[in-house]
Amino acid sequence: MQTSLDRTSTRSGIRLLLFAQGRANIEELAEQLRRHIQGLPGQHPAHLKVVPLEEHPYLAEHYKLVVTPALVKAEPLPAQVLAGEDLATQLEVWWPRWQGQAALVSYQEEAGQDPAPPPTTEALLQMSEEVFSLRQERAQLREQLDFKDRVLAMLVHDLRSPLTATALAVETLQQGREGSLDKAVERQLFEHARQQLRKMDSMITDILESARGSASELRIRAVETQLASLCQPVIEELLPRIQAKQLQFQADIPVDLPTVHVDPDKIRQVIFNLLDNAIKYTPAGGSIRLNILHRTSQKVQVTVSDTGPGIPEAEQENIFSDAVRLSRDQQQEGYGIGLSLCRRIVRAHYGQIWVESILGKGSSFHFTLPVYRLCGR
């Protein structure tokens, strides 16, 4: 007597499927059943296949499984389900009948009496995998559509403030066309309007960039995530370097911070990169701060601040561009590529990233992430 896990379909044999939860448990049970089957009499081989229940829910529905572990005799038809703890004893009881069914199928094949065979077990397994994959893709697409709806709502909310400020500046300029405003005030209003327009342009650009597929290129897998739990391993990993430079480090992460909708690995990479740069550029005895705040009902803001040399104002606009290196960085490793990747990751999460810096005093890198909300809430 032999058992097999190969994919060749022999309809005169006995095709068995073992369903259980947890790979470790199911493999141990499968090995016990293999040894038991080898001791049973019969001319028709048994092909035993392990089927993790969580990976084949459709197949479990097909065989109407209620209790696991379960052993399904899938072929010869009709299918039969054995369930419970003592599968070996039940198998021994039904084994003679299954051998008889296999013998009948073998006779029919030899006599040419079976012109239209039903789908094989392997075909059912493949269909189960495809259905499960389609269900996962449909759920992911639905989640992406819901998420993009929330992003549009966030964009409208964020655009309202600079749009209002621009409108007020233009209205004031229009009212002062008859000379009631002096030139200095006019220049200030024009500059304010230009700044707000640039801010709106940046917001729209971020959304358009993410819509071009940066999320799919980076393979973002967004889930509900606790930022505090995500940050802790990063801090622990970098702590020896912080202590080696005698830097003062402070993390301010509120306990009531809402969960965010992010890819944990990607956002961990962003936080690590920003903290790594802060350690690299902050002189010994300086300070670094990680701060997270609930900015609005829809956003969380993460800030990494340092007391390093700062970034020249003229170079702040391009600091997140691909492979941009500041004049101060020629002796340092990396930097430009890391910040470029940070921007791509944050944009793929429909967030924004920017820097505020004063030369000679330090820098603060900020980025926003979407708050996790259940659909319909």
From Swiss-Prot:
Modified residues (Phosphohistidine): 157
Superkingdom assignment: Bacteria
Catalytic activity: ATP + protein L-histidine = ADP + protein N-phospho-L-histidine
Domain Histidine kinase, first and last residues per copy: 154-373
Keywords: ATP-binding, Biological rhythms, Kinase, Nucleotide-binding, Phosphoprotein, Transferase, Two-component regulatory system
Gene3D superfamilies: 1.10.287.130, Glutaredoxin (3.40.30.10), Histidine kinase-like ATPase, C-terminal domain (3.30.565.10)
InterPro entries: HATPase_C_sf, His_kinase_dom, HisK_dim/P_dom, HisK_dim/P_sf, KaiB_domain, Kinase_SasA, Sig_transdc_His_kin-like_C, Thioredoxin-like_sf
Enzyme class: transferase
Gene Ontology process terms (BP): circadian rhythm
EC number(s) from the headed UniProt entry: 2.7.13.3
GO molecular function annotation: ATP binding; phosphorelay sensor kinase activity
Function according to Swiss-Prot or TrEMBL: Member of the two-component regulatory system SasA/RpaA involved in genome-wide circadian gene expression. One of several clock output pathways. Participates in the Kai clock protein complex, the main circadian regulator in cyanobacteria, via its interaction with KaiC. KaiC enhances the autophosphorylation activity of SasA, which then transfers its phosphate group to RpaA to activate it. In addition to its output function, recruits fold-shifted KaiB (KaiB(fs)) to KaiC to cooperatively form the KaiB(6):KaiC(6) complex (independent of SasA kinase activity).
Subunit comment: Homooligomerizes. Interacts with KaiC. Participates in the KaiABC clock complex, whose core is composed of a KaiC homohexamer, 6 KaiB and up to 6 KaiA dimers. SasA and KaiB(fs) compete to bind to KaiC.
Domain comment, as recorded: The N-terminus interacts with KaiC, while the C-terminal histidine kinase domain autophosphorylates and is probably responsible for self-oligomerization. The N-terminal domain stimulates the C-terminus to autophosphorylate.
Protein's UniProt name: Adaptive-response sensory kinase SasA
